[in-house]
Every structure is written in C-alpha cells, then in structure tokens.
Amino acid sequence: MRALRDPICAIATPLGKGAIGVVRLSGEGALEIAARVWRGKDPRRLKGGRFTLGEVVDPKTGEAIDQALLLVFRAPRSYTGEDLVEFQTHGSLAVLRRVMEVLVAEGARPAGRGEFTFRAYMNGKLDLAQAEAVLALIEAEGELARRQALRALEGALSRRIEALENRLLDLLAHIQALLDYPEEGVEPLEAERTLREVLAEVEALLAQAKASRLAQKGARLALIGAPNAGKSSLLNALLGYERALVSPIPGTTRDYLEAPLELFGIPLVAVDTAGVRETEDPVERMGVERALRIAEEADLVLYVVDRSQPKPAPPPLPWARTLKVATKSDLPPAWEDPEFLPVSSLTGEGLGRLKEALREALLGREGGEVLLTERQVEALLRARERLEEALALPEDLMGLALEEAARALALLTGKEVAEEVVARVFQNFCVGK
C-alpha cells in the first residue's frame, strides 16, 4: 500500500469537454499546497464546508491558469477523513491537466486508482462494503443498481451483517460460559434457534444475489417460438413502441434483433429471434440454430406460442429459466395450458401478469434491494456452510464453526480481510475516486 498521509491529487470528473471540471487534493499539507496555487482568499483560513471564488495560478510565474471555485473540507469531516480541497474549474482538459501539473510541482503526487476512497476506508469513514457501494454507484446503469448501491453506501447491508455477527459472537460467549460454568449455560434449544434464525437471514441475503448481479451487469431476455407465434408483437408491446417488423407472413424474422429495455430498474437487452421450426432452407436453419444458442446464453427466456393455433412440439430450451407465454389471447383458443401465461399484444390483456412473472423471475421474492458483490457472496456462502456445520454438532463442539461463521460475516465489512483483497477491491476504481 502507498503512504497514507502524503498529499494526493487527481482529476475527479470524466476526461473531455464539459462545463465544470474538478481536481481533488487530499492529505497532510493539502491546505498549504492549495494556498500556494491560489489567488484569492487564503484556503487555510476557510472553515470546513466553505467555498471561495478566485484563480488557480502557477506560483513560479504568477500566471493565472483559470478562474475557479475552491472548496475546503477539514479533517475529519471530509470524504477521506483528511484535509481535502476541491478546485472546480472550467471543464477543459487543458485546464485540468495544468492544475494537476502545478499541484504535483508543489509537492502532491498523482493518486492511484480508488485512493481517495481507500483513505476513507482506512480512516474509518467507510467500511469495505460501503466502499464497494461507492464503485457500484459510479457504475450503476439502471435504477435498481442505483438504489441498491445507495442503500449499501448508507450502511444498510453493513448494519444487517453486523447484527448477525453480534448474535453469533454472543452465542459463542454463552457456549464458552456453558463449558466453563455449566450451571449458567444457555439451553440447547436457544442455541439452535439462534443459529437457525441467523442461517435464515444469510439465506435471505443469498436469495438476492442473482438480482444484485443482474442489476449491476444487466440481463439478456430471449424471445423464442415458432414462426408467426407473435414474438415480434410481444417485443413491441414490452418496449412500448414498434421496434420489430410485424407481418402475418411466417418467417419474417430470419435473424435476431436486439432492443434495450429497462424493467423494474434492471437494464435488459431483449432479443427477438428467428422462428424455430424444422426447415430445409439452409439460411432459415442457420437462424433457428442461432435462436437456440441465444436462448441457451440468455438470463431469461420467453417461450412464445400462438394460442389460436395447434400447440407445436417444444424446442430444446433451458426450461429452468424459461417463462411460457400463450400469445393472441384475444382470439378463440385452440388449446389451454395453465403453465402458459395468456397475453394479447394487440389489446394489452395479460401484459401486467407477464411483467409480474418477469419481476419474480429476475428479482425473486425478496425484491432485489440488496447490493452484493461477488466477494460478498463468497463470504456469505462460507458463513452458510459453517452455520450448517454448527447445527450438525453438539453444542459443546460448535464453537469453532461459530467462530469461523462470524469471521466470514466480518469479511463483508472488511473487519477480517487480507490486505491483497482490499487492494483488489480498490484497483477496480477510477482515478479520482
């Protein structure tokens, strides 16, 4: 790890043209460096949370670089927990680079990836779960990812984990007391009940792992079915506008078509595929094979069948993640099947029920409001394994498994985490955050 106290600086806004650009400066001596490159009210005399208008200058020549606002945040009431200064200049890359040059010349060094947030973590302003939430919030592309990240940044996940960890540590202390002073121990039933309650909470968190992954990375939704089954019409109905060409002639879609779609705050790519059927046409056969590959790779599949026509034999699909949809429900039915959701793309009948089914398939019953990174999921899986192990042991032998379960939970917030794991978390950040 780099030195934690030396002054660091970085451009904190995206590179390119813009109305405003921000350069951050943090660490020991940050206010003194800022004073040397500033023409205006002395930053060292400003109270924390105040700003002033002036000019950034080259102290060696006195040349003005840009008019700017200077903001001062004093330790420990700053993002990093250190004295921190922000220069808000015009958003020219030439200006921002020149400001960086004079700051480095005056003793600051360019910050590494995520170094401002790393300092916040090391100075106790954030735990590791909150630091990961900062990155997730920066990278959020959908509304659900934004909500998940903000809740985690506000400490919702950390508080939940800390409560579970404390319950295990309390139970561990009682079991130790039982071994040392048998007459004052806890009843076996109480220990089992506590373990089962903690395990249920861990399971509830893990149940949201899929929704968290989809919220952060997006999902692919494939529409599969026979020619003229109504796939393109259903896609248009879900989108709310006409994206796919619709025709009564079977086989209109011979290749796949993609369209971005956000449902329940999750960024989706909906894929309308070629009709799946037996065919001698080599071009159409290629489209069918591609459609089945797309279904295999999709996060969720809609198997679309025309309810007004005889039901075709089903193609090979990943049924565990497939919803069955009976289209053209406004026409007289040729068959009935309770496994299929009846939908009319023409009238909109059944679209609400289909969206609810999509919601549950994507988010699960828990609702998907918890941000979980891959690292955190691994820690929860380890905790679950140790809790299950503890439940299978007599009370006087479950101490080690309990201790390891508590340690696994502590990994989520960074209490029990190796330095290389911390480094791996922060190297995913951009410079300036």
UniProtKB/Swiss-Prot annotation:
PROSITE patterns: G_TRME. It comes from the Bacteria. The keyword Ligase does not apply. Pfam families: MMR_HSR1, MnmE_helical, TrmE_N. GO terms for biological process: tRNA methylation; tRNA wobble uridine modification. (6S)-5-formyl-5,6,7,8-tetrahydrofolate binds at residues 24, 86, 125, 433. Binds 1 potassium ion per subunit. K(+) binds at residues 228, 247, 249, 252. One of its GO terms (cellular component) is cytosol. Mg(2+) binds at residues 232, 253. Residues 218-363 form the TrmE-type G domain. InterPro entries: G_TrmE, GTP-bd, GTP-bd_TrmE_N, GTPase_MnmE, MnmE_dom2, MnmE_helical, P-loop_NTPase, Small_GTP-bd. Its main location: cytoplasm. Gene3D superfamilies: P-loop containing nucleotide triphosphate hydrolases, Probable tRNA modification gtpase trme, domain 1, tRNA modification GTPase MnmE domain 2. Keywords: Cytoplasm, GTP-binding, Hydrolase, Magnesium, Metal-binding, Nucleotide-binding, Potassium, tRNA processing. It is found in: Cytoplasm. Its EC number is 3.6.-.-. GO terms for molecular function: GTP binding; GTPase activity; metal ion binding. Homodimer. Heterotetramer of two MnmE and two MnmG subunits. Belongs to the TRAFAC class TrmE-Era-EngA-EngB-Septin-like GTPase superfamily. TrmE GTPase family. Exhibits a very high intrinsic GTPase hydrolysis rate. Involved in the addition of a carboxymethylaminomethyl (cmnm) group at the wobble position (U34) of certain tRNAs, forming tRNA-cmnm(5)s(2)U34. This is tRNA modification GTPase MnmE. The gene is mnmE.
